[in-house]
């Protein structure tokens, strides 16, 4: 069984750092505090701890800093906020004057670097009310044990919009992302060798150089400007256009399939059981979810009933095939197994909902998609005419426009670009003129849609000998990159270093003689070896997240941690792609 989340990965590292840097720093025996959070820190804390954890740290009430609140002048307040004008202004309103201040005193902890302008504003207004004011350098969300995001989905538009009027805003976004990435490295106690994918765009190069400079600044240890030596780790920075296929392909592993086909919002799955509407959060506290989320849907549909039969056969409570109704009856008969069984009911519902969508109109699509993506069929024979493979999908009235667009994109990606005439014909015949920018705008990510000349496709690792399901033959490109990085096979021209002193990377876990041994809480979470940290500009897919776990499992000497601006799903990505050539005032942003 998977270990509980408290023993696993990035989430526990982040929680322990917050515990040490914030709660231990302002702890006073027997004293309770009110905690104020903004939108970002609410997500951050929710990702790595529970309310019971906060109660243990002396937090009695949690409030939204943006909302009007009643004063509680006999209590001290702990502000855990982002160093933004909005959050700082909300803090200042709480301590506007001595007669109007809401709390007895304030402890302020910023997620990362607070600009001098904001710091001086605080200092000038209410310094006498402040007991602490610190920066703790955690400006990312630990989504999973090996996955992080910066929670900046709007960065996609600014990084890939062709509108020159967005250039200055793009620079601000890149600077902010670099600051956030440095906090990921700092939290992991890593000073990695920084590399980037040199093509097709220069975003990765620019961001990598910013990150390297900020790492140098962060790890300066004295006035002589000495830098902490590079640790046995690498940070790879990549533009989203490096693998367009994995973003639109229908995936049949459980987590990726569920988030693609079902309306799951904020990791919350809604379902019906026993005639009642219910909700379940898909999170790593659920050991069964951790166990099955990366498995193929066919395996999941076999495994969950098998687990149920183990329980039922032990108690001789049910006989025959395990169904949802049988599970409901079993919970009534054995209330002490209720929690265990209810999780299995959730995941069986989830799997069955996925399969219902799959059988309705996705099953036939998947074979076409795999053939187009790989250029070979299930028998390994080369596809001679991709258009003949695509046509049945375009003519099928049961497929909605989004699925047809995904298929057209896979056709174009598979042949590495088409002609303007052919693209116009496809758009007209499928009647997707209103959504044609979902196809054309991929060029802004450096993906060849209508290239001026035929380009060679990047070589892929031969995985023909690997055992796969026929409808799941595609392997995300990121897996090749992870494996090559660990085995020291990344081409230095294609993957330049921008570090002055790159780590010697051999994946063996060997540590340089210059590197001082460290004994701290991070060692509990770190494998006896190296770390590979990946950052993708513009979103990662659930299938790419899965690869981090698979490669870590296969290469015991290296832990792979993957992150991005945000996590994407195919439909949301296509909506974002469509908006790239729109002016900023026509685009809806997260904070507006």
Curated annotation (Swiss-Prot):
Subunit relationships: Interacts with STX4. Interacts with DOC2B; the interaction is direct, occurs at the cell membrane, excludes interaction with STX4 and regulates glucose-stimulated insulin secretion.
Gene3D superfamilies assigned to the protein according to its UniProt record, in alphabetical order: 1.25.40.60, 3.40.50.1910, 3.40.50.2060, Syntaxin Binding Protein 1, Chain A, domain 2 (3.90.830.10)
Superkingdom field: Eukaryota
Function: Together with STX4 and VAMP2, may play a role in insulin-dependent movement of GLUT4 and in docking/fusion of intracellular GLUT4-containing vesicles with the cell surface in adipocytes.
Record organism: Mus musculus (Mouse)
Alphabetized InterPro entries for the sequence: Sec-1-like_dom1, Sec-1-like_dom3a, Sec1-like, Sec1-like_dom2, Sec1-like_sf
TM stretches of this protein: none
Major location category of this protein: cytoplasm
Expressed in which tissues: Ubiquitously expressed in all tissues tested.
PANTHER family: VESICLE PROTEIN SORTING-ASSOCIATED
Protein name stated in the entry: Syntaxin-binding protein 3
Cellular component, GO annotation: apical plasma membrane; basolateral plasma membrane; cytosol; phagocytic vesicle; plasma membrane; platelet alpha granule; specific granule; tertiary granule
Modification(s) after translation: Phosphorylated by PKC in platelets in response to thrombin stimulation; phosphorylation inhibits binding to STX4.
One of the GO BP terms on file: response to insulin
Source species taxonomy: Eukaryota, Metazoa, Chordata, Craniata, Vertebrata
Record gene name: Stxbp3
Start and end residues of each stretch annotated as Mediates interaction with DOC2B: 1-255
Family: Belongs to the STXBP/unc-18/SEC1 family.
Keyword annotations from UniProtKB, A to Z: Cell membrane, Cytoplasm, Membrane, Phosphoprotein, Protein transport, Transport
